[in-house]
């Protein structure tokens, strides 16, 4: 396999490390900044505050990558769709139901995404040159499912029923979001993002046929579109919960880096790393435990992936109740391991 050299700017034989939701509620310095802005989306669009919280975990832990502080739902919001975040509830959206809703979606864009690009530029100015900056977007199926459900975590009966019963409209919506997502990622790359990531949080609710149509196909289109303008930019895809369909995803989608959740067996990660860089997959709950358990679980991952195409991360985002000192311990442990075993492919 042709090596993707240094996707996270490590110019040595070391294991890149960063964490999903590394900028977030588990950090006291984040809470201090966040409490000054009541509305979450306003916070995401605040250039100075979003820049500050993006940089906080880099200053505290020295991760190999910063991920821009934003949200996957800024895209539909910027397209004029009604999106709000309720405390202790999560996202609440206008529910997409009809062709009239599609016409509305096509005709009410705003310039909110320009703030995201300003944040990327500002972070890039302040970020150490050895640290990568990751831009991201929600994958079309996940964004679409939020719009169809009108809220966050559900059983997805509404979304799945809609795509079964309204195939033409569902495909129109999917294609529209796919196009806008590709544009959003291209603009993030133009603004200075070194790496791009697609989060497909709800891909695991689909069967194989729908997974192909609503996850694989739009992801391929987005990657090919981005690569037209930025052929060398590494792209991470995270089809969370794909289980056995991860293998189909790897085979059919031209990704550089595959992020996997904690349900994926380590031996599968090792096998896949011969075809693609693999990122993952420590269970975030492990960081709620103690140092011995953290060390034990991290060691198993590191030993299995030793010498492979690998980025150390979690299987999902850092939980809000995570002790910051546990994140510090894990990061230092990975660094110590790599010092003793400096024969990684990176």
From Swiss-Prot:
EC number in record: 4.1.1.37
Any one Gene Ontology cellular component term annotated for this protein: cytosol
Keywords in alphabetical order: Cytoplasm, Decarboxylase, Lyase, Porphyrin biosynthesis
Predominant cellular place of this UniProt entry's protein: cytoplasm
Annotated site residue numbers, Transition state stabilizer: 71
Binding locations of substrate: 21-25, 40, 71, 146, 201, 316
Gene Ontology biological-process annotations: protoporphyrinogen IX biosynthetic process
SUPFAM superfamilies: UROD/MetE-like
Locations listed in the record: Cytoplasm
GO molecular function, one term: uroporphyrinogen decarboxylase activity
Biochemical pathway: Porphyrin-containing compound metabolism; protoporphyrin-IX biosynthesis; coproporphyrinogen-III from 5-aminolevulinate: step 4/4
Catalytic activity: uroporphyrinogen III + 4 H(+) = coproporphyrinogen III + 4 CO2
UniProt similarity note: Belongs to the uroporphyrinogen decarboxylase family.
Quaternary organization: Homodimer.
NCBIfam families per record: hemE
Described purpose of this protein according to its UniProt entry: Catalyzes the decarboxylation of four acetate groups of uroporphyrinogen-III to yield coproporphyrinogen-III.
Identification of the protein by name: Uroporphyrinogen decarboxylase
UniProt lineage: Bacteria, Pseudomonadati, Pseudomonadota, Alphaproteobacteria, Rickettsiales
């Amino acid at each position: 396999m042709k090596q993707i050299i240094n996707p996270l700017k490590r110019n040595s034989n070391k294991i890149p490390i960063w964490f999903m939701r590394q900028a977030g509620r588990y950090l006291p310095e984040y809470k201090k900044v966040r409490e000054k802005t009541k509305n979450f989306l306003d916070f995401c669009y605040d250039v100075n505050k979003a820049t500050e919280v993006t940089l906080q975990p880099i200053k505290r832990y020295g991760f190999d990558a910063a991920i821009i502080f934003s949200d996957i739902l800024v895209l539909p919001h910027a397209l004029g769709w009604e999106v709000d975040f309720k405390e202790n509830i999560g996202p609440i959206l206008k529910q997409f139901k009809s062709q009239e809703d599609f016409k509305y979606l096509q005709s009410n864009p705003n310039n909110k995404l320009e703030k995201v690009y300003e944040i990327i530029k500002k972070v890039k100015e302040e970020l150490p040159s050895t640290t990568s900056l990751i831009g991201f977007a929600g994958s079309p199926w996940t964004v679409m499912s939020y719009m169809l459900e009108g809220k966050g975590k559900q059983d997805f009966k509404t979304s799945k029923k809609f795509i079964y019963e309204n195939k033409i409209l569902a495909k129109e919506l999917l294609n529209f979001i796919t196009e806008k997502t590709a544009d959003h990622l291209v603009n993030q790359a133009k603004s200075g993002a070194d790496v791009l990531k697609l989060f497909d949080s709800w891909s695991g609710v689909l069967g194989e046929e729908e997974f192909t149509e609503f996850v694989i196909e739009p992801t391929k289109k987005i990657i090919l579109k981005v690569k037209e303008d930025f052929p060398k930019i590494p792209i991470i895809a995270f089809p969370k919960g794909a289980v056995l369909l991860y293998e189909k995803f790897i085979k059919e989608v031209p990704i550089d880096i595959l992020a996997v959740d904690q349900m994926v067996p380590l031996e599968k990660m090792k096998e896949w790393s011969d075809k693609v860089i693999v990122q993952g997959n420590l269970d975030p709950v492990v960081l709620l435990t103690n140092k011995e358990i953290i060390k034990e679980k991290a060691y198993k991952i590191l030993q299995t992936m030793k010498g492979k195409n690998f980025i150390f991360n979690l299987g999902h985002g850092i939980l809000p109740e995570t002790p910051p000192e546990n994140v510090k311990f894990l990061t230092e442990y990975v660094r110590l391991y790599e010092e003793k075993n400096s024969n990684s492919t990176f």
